[in-house]
Amino acid sequence: MAQQIQVDLGERSYPIYIGQSLMSDSETLSRYLLKKRILIVTNETVAPLYLKQVQDTMASFGEISSVILSDGEQFKDLTHLDSIFTALLQRNYGRDSVLVALGGGVIGDMTGFAAACYQRGIDFIQIPTTLLSQVDSSVGGKTAVNHPLGKNMIGAFYQPQIVIIDTECLQTLPAREFAAGMAEVIKYGIMWDADFFQWLENNVQALKSLDTQALVYAISRCCEIKADVVSQDETEQGVRALLNLGHTFGHAIEAEMGYGNWLHGEAVAAGTVLAAQTAKSLGLIDESIVCRIVQLLQAFDLPVKAPESMDFESFIQHMRRDKKVLGGQIRLVLPTAIGRAEVFSQVPESTLEQVICCA
């Protein structure tokens, strides 16, 4: 029996389904796709694994086409976004069409942004296939592509019709990608739920061995938190900013090192440690909390230090372009306890320099 979580946004509310074999659940999918013209957007890694299965599930719904993109963060740009528009236009797809995002965070972000733009908005659904996309990027309506000068700088808030999370996809996920997803899972515990953080500490081996019950619980709890936050603050004017814990530092790492060289979750992991160390420098938390965060990230084989090649100037030039900057002030999400975080807008750059140089 699939778990269901509702993202409550009035007329734009939608369900998240979490369970096994959901990509073969034609009954659920038919509610959103029956008699529609469907374009499945996927990538060259996911297509051999799941494209035919999804096509077979949707075979009776209507016209189905697909577009297969290159795999990787380095392809999340306007040039490759255009491939989706070209596929839609070549097939004369109109406003009654639906895009299906079948893949990880890159595919979900690009498909959602394409849906937001095409003919000023068409429906799309999310079928995330990586842990990171299942617990984070597929929920909440953030869609975007990257620019060479900054991550996710060109995008829109645009909600899906439904999110289908099939946990069986994780059986084919490379270990490095699974670890990257765990960085976002751990983030939820740090910024929102201390009990969940402790549960993660106690269930490392169950999660790493892909225990179904543990995975469903972890994914469900993350989606519950994300749904709660998004329902309160869809466009990140307040509490939703807390979901960016580790991301200001992390996005700087991704941009500086070249998109795709560090996975998003790896950069977030290192960024989360830098955020915790900044909080410690400001007297917000003590060393024991930093140690718990570092130890849990390390337990999932995640990096806890920034690249040695990055100095303070490398970080700060990217952080000044961060989307959360207001009035020229860098705004950082910092933990104030396990289970709590706040946004700080006046962290001295001298403090950041000390943290980065000593990390």
Curated annotation (Swiss-Prot):
InterPro entries: Dehydroquinate_synthase (IPR050071), DHQ_synth_AroB (IPR016037), DHQ_synth_fam (IPR030963), DHQS/DOIS_N (IPR030960), DHQS_C (IPR056179)
Residue positions binding Zn(2+): E184, H247, H264
Keyword Methyltransferase included in the entry's annotation: no
EC number: 4.2.3.4
Entry binding sites for NAD(+): 71-76, 105-109, 129-130, 142, 151, 169-172
Pfam families for this protein: DHQ_synthase, DHQS_C
GO molecular function: 3-dehydroquinate synthase activity; metal ion binding; nucleotide binding
Family: Belongs to the sugar phosphate cyclases superfamily. Dehydroquinate synthase family.
Protein's name in the database: 3-dehydroquinate synthase
Organism: Shewanella oneidensis (strain ATCC 700550 / JCM 31522 / CIP 106686 / LMG 19005 / NCIMB 14063 / MR-1)
Lineage: Bacteria, Pseudomonadati, Pseudomonadota, Gammaproteobacteria, Alteromonadales
Gene: aroB
